[in-house]
Amino acid sequence: MCGIHVTVARDDFEPLPLPTRTCLCNRGPDHLGEVRTRAHPQNGDADPLFLSFTSTVLALRGDHVTKQPFRDAPSGSALCWNGEAWKIGGEPVQGNDGEAIFKLLMEACCRTTSQDAVLDVLRSVEGPFAFVFFDAASSRLVFGRDRLGRRSLLFNQEGGLRLSSIAESTSQAWKEVEADGIYVLDLSTWSRNPEEAFSPRPWSQEDGETILNIGAFNWTLPPPDAAPLTATSPSVMAIREKLTQSLKPRVLDVPTPPAHDASNNTRISVLFSGGLDCTVLARLASDLLPPDQGIDLINVAFENPRLASKAGISVDGVSIYEACPDRITGRKSFAELTAVCPERRWRLIAVSYPPRSSHRAITDLFSQVDVPYQEVLAHRSQVIALMYPHNTEMDLSIAYALYFAARGIGMAQSHPSAATSKYATPARVLLSGLGADELFGGYVRHPSAFARGGYQSLLEEIKLDVGRLGKRNLGRDDRAMSHWGREVRFPYLDEQFVKWAIECPVWEKCDFGVGEEVTGIEPGKRVLRLLAQELGMTSVAREKKRAIQFGSRTAKMESGKTKGTMLITP
């Protein structure tokens, strides 16, 4: 994973602001590289343009730290690459993926139809990424995010063009690059009309309607004699195989972290609410990892004085954190994991915020601005800056949970009955269960849709959710978590896994036609629940869904009247 910053200016090379450089280095602490070059637009007497490329690197692929930006000295072309190309053209990538991508792009630039060839290379990539590629021969800038928008890329057209993993400021000119295609900017045209709007090239040139240019949505309604989902249903066996295949490149061969302790060989951590989606990932990851590697489970809980006051719980009491829904389910699922995989070295990291060592109530911070609390105030402004251009109370609630979870510092224990001690995870890879609710009917609105109009209404609702995956706030989440020099990976959003899920008949994923009273397991995400049961986790299989901001209690800390759509006050 990397940090990207690119500027195109008319008058001179633009320096990188120090705060931006610092944030980029937080994302990629292993290397900082800069390349400057001039572009000579192919329109006669136009003045040259000044291009500055900056990349920082978090080295997670290959056997060495690969320096960026990539640059081809003879041509002057350059690439800033932030992502993980798990496959190119359907084939697994060996070694460093950025090097492989740049090699293919330079070969494509030599072809007669170079623009189409460059687009074809990028279309063939499977995995999360954001990139900026300068094709010097044609004076074109090509940039974008993967079709699911799993990595951050922002742009600003004030006084030139800036492309960056993070915003330099909270100026309203910063916007997200949409994950709707590959953007190609002809610098010859842009030099004459820099205000011209960008238009993307499509991710796919295939005819026919597809979801996210990945697969065709299955609209088939269940036949009258459709068998109810059981543990032996083909889709339960298939989801285990598909999810395992998705996990393999994401958890295997992760380099040893720089802060490696010989007594603690831990390279993978899980954003762990104790819910169904993340616990299944942890359980399957345990099947894949070598026996000497540990798995850290990061569970975050916030002190919410509004709820504490309502419940009559002391804001200074330990029970504030232990009463959080995600802490309760986290401990329960942790116990189940240690029971079904006793040989694995599990570690539950309880991240409580504010830390228990601090006895100043968070109400003093948020509702009484005149009360100093410098550490928390500093974090608040940092989180607001990172999540920008998103700026609502809902954004802040979610970003808080992800930001402090990714920091990975808390009280840890290796067994439910073991003593706790302060701990910081060395793992640089975070696994997230995001995507399962959209694919398998896990939201509250899905049973409501079924009650309203049967399977037809349910299919329409799921299609809307899946179609919006590329427009989810994954860029915001990437900025919040990557700040700590860690990379989040989404096994449920693997392209091949998504393709299988959307092409699978709906009754083989969430058979709302068969009630919970018949099977003992609720219909939403039933295929995943049955997998959890097959993996020996009967309690996890019956766990209810909660949104992250409510499970960790970051929502409505100050007032129950606060709406998620309200704009925040920096």
Feature names for model-found ranges:
Residues 57, 85, 133-135, 147-148, ...:
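Short, flexible loop/turn elements at secondary-structure junctions
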Residues 422-570:
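Mid-to-C-terminal catalytic subdomains of enzymes
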Residues 11-12, 91, 108-112, 140, ...:
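Short helix-capping/linker segments at secondary-structure and domain boundaries
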Residues 14, 99, 177, 237, ...:
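A structural signal for well-ordered alpha-helical segments within the folded catalytic domains
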Residues 301-420, 427, 445-455, 478-487, ...:
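ATP-dependent adenylate-handling ligase core
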